[in-house]
Curated annotation (Swiss-Prot):
Pfam families: TIMELESS, TIMELESS_C. The gene is Timeless. Residues 647-674, 943-1002, 1088-1197 are annotated as: Disordered. One of its GO terms (molecular function) is enzyme activator activity. Induction: In retina, expression exhibits a circadian rhythm in the presence of light/dark cycles. In the suprachiasmatic nucleus (SCN), isoform 1 exhibited 24 hours oscillation, isoform 4 is constitutively expressed. Shows a circadian expression pattern in the intestine with peaks at ZT4 and ZT8. This is Protein timeless homolog. The modification Phosphoserine is found at residues 281, 1071, 1084, 1165. One of its GO terms (cellular component) is chromatin. It is found in: Nucleus; Chromosome. Residues 1-309 are annotated as: Required for homodimerization and for interaction with CRY1 and CHEK1. Residues 997-1095 are annotated as: Interaction with PARP1. Plays an important role in the control of DNA replication, maintenance of replication fork stability, maintenance of genome stability throughout normal DNA replication, DNA repair and in the regulation of the circadian clock. Required to stabilize replication forks during DNA replication by forming a complex with TIPIN: this complex regulates DNA replication processes under both normal and stress conditions, stabilizes replication forks and influences both CHEK1 phosphorylation and the intra-S phase checkpoint in response to genotoxic stress. The modification Phosphothreonine is found at residue 1086. Residues 656-673, 963-985, 1099-1109, 1143-1153 have a biased composition (Acidic residues).
Length: 1197
């Protein structure tokens, strides 16, 4: 329906309601249906609220709905429909639009709707309309619960909502232009409520225990009734002017008179007897112009005091996001009869309704029966009525419901939550700041009421006050609250009134706390601090054990005897041990030193058989370089090698031992359970006051002091008292030595009405005198005026610069002697080029005289000029670039000359080189030495494909892609992928499966040994299920892995299991909105099945069963023919087990090969193959190739 048709239908519908003639409204026969049509139109209006605007422009509420409401009340269906339509029409504009629109066009519609709402409010300001509503509400409340229907409850709620909506409409200040003691539209509305008796019904709903379901509606209406009022003014209505009020008014008039007299004197000085056409020009000595000369002044001398270099300059525009928050609350004094009515309403409300209503509202809030942010009305009512009770006849029993520790805790929790939300929800920061202000006012009134109870003549009231104060001052949260509020104060969101209330509340709290401490003598308070676990100090030295060389020599005979027994009786030797950690992030090639450390630990612990088993296992894993002995080593040589390992200082990583893993887990659990450590200590008021000696807090006080003319006398007193506590009480006058504050003092002292601010003037003179006394001793104090200072700078200004360093001399590191520097230089030059070790750790292992830290050694190396920067010694993750020594270059040249005619030059060099480097580093060095001219010369040479070999039974052996030697395809790889081994871990999961297949199988085997077989089966089934779904649906999307059992959930939290997931290409949760690990969309169904197959324990066991018997130890590995025969035997065995003929297998292989896309990328892991080949070569087992390479299928876009 377009806009034109909507206008026509709205016009027809409004005309069908009826007409007003001579004060009597004549309704049409289909009036009820027309009202329902209007409700339906409002339900379907657009975002500009066009229907609402057209009805407001037609004044449908003033001309039709109000007359129907007042004259046709007996027609109940029509009356209910009109009430329902009026509730919709008077809905606040903020609820209609969600918030104040920022777009200019939408803001125009917002302001238009607001204008119509203000017209509705003016139309309702009549006794007749509220009289009908009051009578209807009275009749409905007379019905008992057994007679009241659901329609009656709906009508009660709608009437309360209608009253709420009318009172919620803000006043149009520009249109009304009302002053104090003048009747505004809001005052007329309140008077109509009073005359109609609606206020009595609100009091009844507040006090009745049977009508508690309307408590939040009633509280919201009452808060809107007193929106522009102040409790102190209402409490003093009709009691005459008090002496204190008269003295305050006289002081304000005296200030105005003094300023007016000063202005008259200034104007008199400016009036000259002669004209100023021949006044002349003057030079202002000491005031420089743009150049080096003095300023030339062309005006009269009487204008000299108003001279400024900023005259004529364009004022600097403050960005909108940095502008100070504006005051939104407007306080005005209503007409006398309205104030008298409101005062009587407050008194009766406190007498009969406050405690039951606040109890019911608190119950709704705690049971979450209220709407969002309804607690703000609760805190407003608490602040307003407790202040009214204090200003009138103070009776603590009238507000006993909200005078408890639970209320303090509730307000403090909301206040903390509001400022935390203000920091996180930046878009709604202004709204959170307003709620924060309401909570602060409630907290202020709670403290003021408790303070007033101290002066009550009743002993029971004073005892209650003492108990409350004892609990408040004991808890740390209440003491830290004001410090946190000052730190989080932001002028962009908090108006000046918030800062004023915060300063006054802090003043009251400190005054109560100081008085309480003096009366008690000593006060025990609660102290909370976060318990931080100190990391275990691990020795940075190379030797982790404290045995001297002599002790090690004495230990060796016993170890040698155990080793001889193991050699004579093989049954005494232990089973082989895995010498490396397969789940570690450190590559296996780099774990050789750690394996040697484990051997040394076994020897020092007296476990010679375990050390021997580790040595033999490490020899199989790392045969290169004969670091753990040659493959044909004799038992005697093994003993000598173990003796060398025992006496050699080895570098150790700063990690806890395996035996302490359980203790660490227990400590982590204790740390989670005991995050905060609670203790008690004796309270020191001065120590607490020192927490306020901060530049952030002082700047907030100075900001409020700038408006000292607009501040009340009490506010200025609170500012002066706090600054005096910091300056005189703590002896930190230098904290206030700031140029902007001195400019403010200058303006204060030159104010004509300075006599009215005696306290501020006295304090300003005191601070300025202290500054000049310090400046006579410390000339740098003038420069310090430009900066805000903390307590450390204040101490240096007053006690001398460098006093902080002298105070902490006991914590300084000892000086380096010339002998230590010479030893440091010698050690650094000797070990800086040694690969595979940290030069700083090696130096620390040899520095025995004075214990040094790593940081001290590094900084002294830089200071001595041996190193250029500290960054040279930073521990980098991954493989570090190690310089090639001359011997290593010669070895590389020898190996190249030896294997230059072989099919795989680079592979042979990688197998036989002593110092292990990545393929990319070896290739780069070969190019740098000029041994090869281009990388292509190092590619593995492809052999000519021969006719397919026949099996023993005469059948052809199919050659699947997974059976091919991955090294043959090495030349098809990109250079970066085939050579840079370091980047394999950083590849995506789809590109790194080939290199991670073997490590995934090893991880799966270790996880099965730990008892995680069931989670592995669940993971495998999830991968297969995802592969089936992707084949059926044809589309791929990330699939979460949701553990449904407790065992699977614990496995997902296991670090080793997570490492396996990463190896398989499953990605962890990427953001705060994701909880589960996900199978990426880029993995195809074929890849998922291959990954699942790598987890199959049965397949691994079958492969191990089919492996031939080990051969003679010491052989370097099977030949190419032996390897081919082993592969064929393995394939035929698999066929016999699966019952699959060779023809079917060949067809299946051909289908898989032909169905592959055009773009194929083959990834392999030469390093892992070489390692496995060496391991099997040492043990004499023929190497059987498993699936080491996968086809990564890339879809063409």
């Amino acid at each position: 329906m377009d806009l034109y048709m909507m206008n026509c239908e709205l016009l027809a519908t409004c005309s069908a309601l009826g007409y007003l003639e001579g004060g009597t409204y004549h309704k049409e026969p289909d009036c009820l249906e027309s009202v329902k049509d209007l409700i339906r139109y409002l339900r379907h209006e657009d975002e500009t609220r066009d229907v609402r605007q057209q009805l407001g422009a037609a004044q449908i509420l003033q001309s039709d709905l109000l007359p129907i409401l007042t004259q046709h009340r007996q027609d109940k269906p029509l009356f209910d429909a009109v009430i329902r339509l009026m509730v919709n029409l008077t809905q606040p504009a903020l609820l209609c639009f969600g918030s104040v629109p920022k777009d200019s066009s939408v803001r125009h519609h917002f302001l238009q709707v607001l204008t119509y709402l203000q017209a509705y409010k003016e139309a309702f300001a009549s006794e007749k309309a509220f009289g009908v509503l009051s009578e209807t509400l009275y009749e409905l409340l007379q019905l008992g619960w057994e007679d009241r229907q659901e329609e009656d409850n709906l009508l009660i709620e709608r009437i309360l909502l209608l009253v709420r909506n009318i009172l919620h409409v803000p006043a149009n200040l520009e249109q009304e232009k009302s002053i104090d003691d003048d009747a505004s539209i809001h005052d007329r509305l309140l008077w109509a409520i009073h005359l109609s008796g609606m206020d009595d019904l609100l009091l009844f709903l507040s006090s009745s225990s049977a009508e508690q379901q309307w408590s939040l509606h009633v509280l919201e209406i009452i808060s809107l009734m007193f929106r522009d009022q102040t409790p102190e003014q209402l409490a003093g209505v009709g009691q005459g002017r008090l002496a204190q009020e008269r003295s305050t008014d006289v002081a304000e008039l005296e200030v105005l008179r003094q300023r007016e007299m000063a202005e008259k004197r200034a104007r008199a000085l400016q009036r000259g007897n002669r004209h100023s056409r021949f006044g002349g020009s003057y030079i202002v000595q000491g005031l420089k112009s743009i150049g080096e000369k003095d300023v030339v002044f062309h005006k009269g001398l009487h204008n000299l005091q108003n001279y400024s270099s900023d005259l004529g300059k364009q004022p600097r525009r403050v960005p909108k996001r940095r502008q100070a928050a504006q005051e939104l609350s407007v306080h005005r004094r209503s007409v006398l009869n309205v104030r008298l009515f409101l005062r009587d309403f407050c008194s009766e409300f406190l007498e009969n309704c406050y405690n039951p209503l606040m109890g019911a509202v608190k119950d709704h809030l705690l049971r979450e029966r209220a709407q969002q942010h309804d607690e703000t009305y609760y805190m407003w009512a608490m602040a307003f009525f407790m202040a009214f009770n204090r200003a009138a006849t103070f009776r603590p029993g009238l507000v006993s419901e909200t005078l408890s520790i639970r209320t303090f805790h509730f307000v403090e929790q909301n206040l903390t939550n509001y400022y935390e939300m203000m920091l996180t929800d930046r878009k709604e920061a202004a709204s959170w700041a307003r709620r924060m202000h309401l909570a602060l006012k409630a907290y202020q009134e709670l403290l003021a009421t408790v303070n007033e109870m101290d002066m009550c003549p009743d002993e029971a009231v004073r005892e209650s006050s003492r108990i409350i104060k004892n609990n408040i001052f004991y808890m740390m949260e209440y003491r830290e609250l004001f410090l946190a509020l000052f730190r989080k104060f932001d002028e962009r969101y908090h108006p000046r009134s918030f800062l004023r209330d915060l300063v006054e509340t802090t003043h009251l709290f400190l005054k109560m706390l100081e008085r309480f401490c003096r009366s008690r003598g000593n006060l025990m308070v609660q102290n909370k601090r976060k318990k931080r676990k100190k990391k275990k100090k691990v020795q940075d030295q190379g030797v982790a054990f404290s045995q001297s060389p002599g002790e090690l020599e004495a230990m060796w005979p016993a170890l040698a005897e155990q080793l001889l027994q193991c050699a004579q009786d093989p049954e005494l030797s232990v089973d082989p041990v895995v010498p490396f950690d397969a789940a570690s992030e450190v590559p296996v090639e780099e774990q050789r030193v750690e394996a040697m450390v484990r051997i040394q630990d076994c020897l020092t612990a007296g476990q010679a058989p375990q050390a021997l088993a580790l040595l033999r296992s490490a020899r199989e894993v790392w045969p290169e370089g004969n670091a753990f002995g040659s493959p044909v080593i004799s038992p005697g040589e093994e003993m000598q090698l173990l003796k060398q390992i025992l006496s050699t200082p080895l570098p150790r990583q700063q990690e806890p031992e395996e035996g302490d893993a359980e203790e660490e887990e227990e400590e982590e659990e204790e740390e989670e359970l005991q995050v905060v450590q609670v203790s008690e200590k004796e309270f020191n008021f001065l120590e607490y006051l020192k927490r306020f000696a901060s530049s952030t807090i002082v700047r907030a006080y100075v900001l409020l002091l700038r408006s000292y003319r607009q501040n009340s006398a009490h506010t200025n007193h609170c500012i002066a008292k706090m600054l005096h506590r910091l300056a005189h009480g703590l002896g930190m006058e230098a904290l206030l030595f700031q140029l902007s504050l001195f400019c403010l003092f200058n303006r204060l002292l030159s104010d004509p009405a300075a006599a009215a601010y005696k306290e501020l003037v006295t304090f300003a003179k005191y601070i300025i005198g202290k500054f000049f006394a310090l400046a006579a001793v410390n000339q740098k104090a003038f420069v310090e005026l430009l900066f805000w200072k903390n307590t450390a700078v204040v101490r240096e200004m007053t006690q001398g610069y460098g006093s902080l360093d002298s105070g902490s001399s006991s914590h300084r590191a000892p000086l380096w002697s010339p002998e230590e520097e010479a030893q440091l230089q010698e050690l650094y030059l000797a070990h800086k080029d040694v690969e595979g070790q940290d030069v700083v750790e090696t130096i620390l292992a040899h520095l025995k005289v004075v214990p040094r830290t790593r940081k001290q050694v590094i900084h002294h190396l830089v200071r001595m000029g041996l190193a250029d920067s500290v960054k040279e010694f930073q521990k980098r993750k991954g493989t570090q670039i190690v310089l090639w020594t001359e011997d290593q270059e010669l070895e590389l040249q020898r190996l190249f000359e030896e294997f230059r005619d072989s099919d795989d030059v680079l592979g042979q060099i990688m197998k036989n080189i002593t110092a292990k480097r990545s393929r990319a580093r070896v290739v780069d060095k070969l190019l740098a030495l000029g041994l090869v001219s281009e990388r292509r010369q190092l590619y593995k040479k492809r052999r000519k494909k021969l006719a397919p070999s026949c099996m023993q039974n005469g059948e052809k052996s199919p050659r699947d892609p997974w059976q091919e030697d991955p090294e043959e395809e090495d030349e098809h790889l990109p250079e970066d992928e085939s050579e840079d081994e370091e980047s394999e871990e950083g590849l995506p999961s789809g590109q790194g499966q080939g290199s991670s297949s073997l490590s995934a199988e090893n991880l799966g085997e270790s996880l099965r040994q730990e008892g995680l077989s069931a989670p592995l089966l669940w993971l495998q089934s999830s991968l297969i299920r995802a592969a089936n779904d992707r084949e059926e649906d044809g589309c791929s999307q990330a699939i979460p892995l949701v553990p449904l059992t407790e065992e699977n959930e614990e496995a997902m939290e296991n670090e080793q299991f997570q490492h396996l997931l990463r190896k398989l290409g499953i990605r962890p949760p990427s953001s705060g909105q994701e909880t589960f690990w996900r199978i990426p969309a880029k993995l195809s169904s074929t890849q998922l099945r291959r990954v699942a197959a790598s987890l199959s324990q049965q397949e691994n066991e079958e492969e191990r069963e089919e492996e031939p018997e080990p051969g003679v130890p010491g052989e370097q590995g099977p030949s190419e023919e032996h390897r081919t025969e082993a592969l064929r035997a393995l394939l035929s065995a698999r066929k016999r087990k699966a019952g699959l003929g060779p023809t079917e297998e060949e067809a299946t292989g051909e289908e898989e090969w032909n169905s592959a896309p055009k773009k194929r990328q083959l990834l392999d892991s030469d390093e892992e193959e070489d390692d496995e080949g060496r391991r099997q070569a040492v043990s004499g087992t023929p190497r059987v190739h498993r699936k080491k390479r996968f086809q990564i299928e890339d879809e063409d876009d």
